[in-house]
Amino acid sequence: MFNLNFFNYTCHCEWCFWVLPSYNGLGLTPQMGWDNWNTFACNVSEDLLLNTADRISDIGLKDLGYKYVILDDCWSSGRDEDGFLVADEQKFPNGMGHVADRLHNNSFLFGMYSSAGEYTCAGYPGSLGREEEDAQFFANNRVDYLKYDNCYNKGRFGTPESSHKRYKAMSDALNKTGRPIFYSLCNWGQDLTFYWGSDIANSWRMSGDITAEFSRPDSRCPCDGDEYDCKYAGYHCSIMNILNKAAPMGQNGGIGGWNDLDNLEVGVGNLTDDEEKTHFSMWAMVKSPLIIGADVNHLKASSYSIYSQSSVIAINQDPKGIPATRVWRYYVPQTDKYGQGEIQFWSGPLENGDQVIALLNGGMKARPMNATLEDIFFDSYQGSEELSTSWDIYDLWANRIDNATASAILENNKVTNNTLYNATKLSYKEGLLNGDSRLFGTKVGTISPDGIINTTVPAHGIALYRLRSSS
């Protein structure tokens, strides 16, 4: 086993690079919701969106914060004689305004899709050069969110300046409409988006498209996990590939502008339960958007219980808005069938002086892992308050609902009182201040100043803890 890398990017005065506000007042926490693409691709319709929204509401996910219902590519039939986009009447017989109104009446927010190119990725009309009329189309149809892709861009990339200019055109057009529209860039991290995205957008993709694989290399995702400035982002990128690319980028994401690691693959494909937990945990840790990519009408109980784990969601929605940092990373000899094997330790500050830590085992065998306070508070000086304090340890997965409870909710299409946290009634910030146990997990011990947290982490699994001062 050998030391591969050590990332230490957190500022000593932790507020100093979080001073820029949201450029449009939106995105104060990472967005949460559902997008059709990972499961349904071009098979979209009014019924799909509205039925999915009903299901998200009925099984309690909306009240956990999954508020955006995002229609991806393939919704248009072209442009009218005035140059405005037209919705496909076969798929959306009542028009987009009707869909928006139905979603708004059920307390959802409506998202749509276009591309900063001549065409969308599926070959439908794109918005390059037509930003103002398309932004007005979205505003007229009461859209709350725009996912803006990168296909058929006529070669207008290659430098940060060229990509910034192309995406800023839509940012300006959206702002000009006067309607608050969350702006989500999907340019795959091309041209160092993490340096300039927060100037014009609320989130930005930082890699090629995700696939439901934990660690499998794929030639269609040619850059390995250490190539954060990937020149050819590709697609079919594994969870670990994307996570490793994201590791140094936390310093560039925060309140109002988030690094987007792509939609969640929990409930998509054949990931193990531990792999799904690791995936969800780490997206929460680095403050990526939590966008469900699965068919919520056919979720298995274990995947549903992951999406509904409010103690982990509370990490993602923490008002401090600081992504966790990867403190250390080692390769291990217990590799999986793809020859991949590593362990990692991540740590990050939370509101009210709390801290979140993750011990991640990317190897193929369960292994003991540990952390000291010097690991956890890696930027603290000797004798600092953090290192001389005892901390209560809360396991953020220990209070996960069991499969029987999850199955009953899914089968009955109803959540009984207090089974799940309701962030609509009480925000995560308020719930934590009130000490709601559903947001803390289960207390499993205390670490003293000279102590060590010891645990055994399963293959492709994670141990995730919230620490709170004992004093």
UniProtKB/Swiss-Prot annotation:
Cleavable signal peptide: 1-18
Keywords for this entry? Answer: Disulfide bond, Glycoprotein, Glycosidase, Hydrolase, Secreted, Signal
Q: Glycoprotein: is it a keyword of this entry?
A: yes
What residues form the catalytic site here? 149, 209
Disulfide bridge map: 42-74, 121-151, 221-237, 223-230
First-level EC class:
hydrolase
| Pfam family for this entry, one | Melibiase_C
| GO aspect biological process, one term | melibiose catabolic process
Which Enzyme Commission number(s) are listed? Answer: 3.2.1.22
Gene3D superfamilies cross-referenced by the UniProt entry: Aldolase class I, Golgi alpha-mannosidase II
Q: Where does substrate bind?
A: 72-73, 147, 205, 251
Under catalytic activity, the entry for this protein gives:
Hydrolysis of terminal, non-reducing alpha-D-galactose residues in alpha-D-galactosides, including galactose oligosaccharides, galactomannans and galactolipids
Checking InterPro entries in the record gives:
Aldolase_TIM (IPR013785), Glyco_hydro_27 (IPR002241), Glyco_hydro_27/36_CS (IPR000111), Glyco_hydro_b (IPR013780), Glyco_hydro_melibiase (IPR006215), Glycoside_hydrolase_SF (IPR017853), Melibiase_C (IPR041233)
Instruction: Give me the Gene Ontology terms describing cellular component.
Output: extracellular region
Q: Which domain of life is it from?
A: Eukaryota
* Glycosylated position list: 43, 105, 175, 270, 370, 403, 417, 422, 454
Query: Which GO molecular function terms does the record list?
Result: alpha-galactosidase activity
Localization per Swiss-Prot or TrEMBL: Secreted
Q: Which family does it belong to?
A: Belongs to the glycosyl hydrolase 27 family.
Complex and partners: Homotetramer.
Quote the protein name from its UniProt record.
Alpha-galactosidase
Its source organism is Saccharomyces paradoxus
